[in-house]
Every structure is written in structure tokens, then in C-alpha cells.
């Protein structure tokens, strides 16, 4: 495996910036810190990872004990937890700007679903938080949400009149389209396969908890064939995992 692929992999999953390998530091510690930082960035909640271990001999990594703290207004300590994550990096990296992940496997994913007095669940709130963050950072991927944000930030606009004069185009289109990148092209990542061996849903409504168990859950390809910016991958993964609680 070439060194460039190792460097790209060090910012896998939940990452905020493109940093190259630090000669004086540990790749495993760096990966761990980036996962925790990105978990917090997208959800606003504390993300914790016990250990990250990357092997350049097998082009793979293993993450142990990954948790995301629950919203403070709910009872469960964590909204989700994963005991082990296995990551298989593609042996063939055709481009220095696109890192390909063959497969990510979660051994056991636990999601705690709770509703407040108004009937709104912690999952709904977190999905909204993550979606809004993604829409602000990557409006071209979330045009509908981005358009709502734009309208809220510009209350002087007459939404109804605007819709009549500019159906699905105009200012909103201009606002949501990708901005031209300045300087070097940004590295991207794609995940070909995403599998969850065991999914445990703890659903609490009106003080009563129901346990639902599912096995061999497949999440859609993330990043398509061309990949998406590495900074975006973390939010997309969180969003996909939380949406499993709604299916």
C-alpha cells in the first residue's frame, strides 16, 4: 500500500480537515481524535472512541467502542453505540484525490430511541441537526433544506411570489449550487459497501421500552462513483445510521 493511501485513510469516516501524516505523532491517535471531533461537529454531542487501529499490511482498520452521547433532555446516556467497526480499504487506489473503501462492517449497532412530552424523538432532532449542518456546508447536496435556510436568513423575500416567478430556479438555485473551488482540488472518498451485522433498537414511548432486533442491514453506497468531499463523509455516515431507527 502506498504512503499516499495511508495518509488519505487517516482522515476516514468523521473528519474535518485534510491533514497529512504527522511524523511525530500516532496515526491511530490522529484517526481517533478526528472521529471524535467530527462526531461532535455534526451532531453537537460528544463522540467517544476507545481505540482505533490501522494496519497497512492488510489495508484495514478496526474501531472499538464508538459512542455518541444522547441529547440532554432524554434519559439514555448514548443515542448510539457500536462495539466494533471493521474497515476495508481498496487495494487499488487509482487517484490520489479519491480514496476508495471497499467495505465498512459494524458488528453491533445499538440505537436508543426516545420521545419527549411533545412526541418528538431524539432521533428526529439529531437528524435535523445533522441535516442542517450538512446543508449549510454542502448546499448543492441538500437544495431543499438549503433553500429553507436561505429563506429564513432573508425574511424580506416573498416566498410565494418568488415561487411563482422562479419555480425551482433563480436565487435558490444560485445559492445551492456548488461554489467554485479555489486552489487545489479537494480529496474525496467513496464507500462501496456498508453492512451492519446486528442492529438493536431500544424504543421508549411513554415510559415503556420495546426491543427490536434486526440482522444483516445494508446501507446504501456512500459517495457514489465519484466520491464526496472527505469532510462530508462523517455527516453522511451519521445521518444514514440514525435513519435506520426510522425504518
Show which residues each predicted segment covers:
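Short, functional N-terminal and low-complexity linear motifs
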Residues: 2-7, 51-55, 93
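Generic alpha-helical scaffold signal
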Residues: 29, 57-60, 76-81
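N-terminal leader/targeting pre-sequences
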Residues: 41-73, 197
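N-terminal type II signal-anchor transmembrane helix
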Residues: 1-43
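Secondary-structure transition motifs
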Residues: 68-247
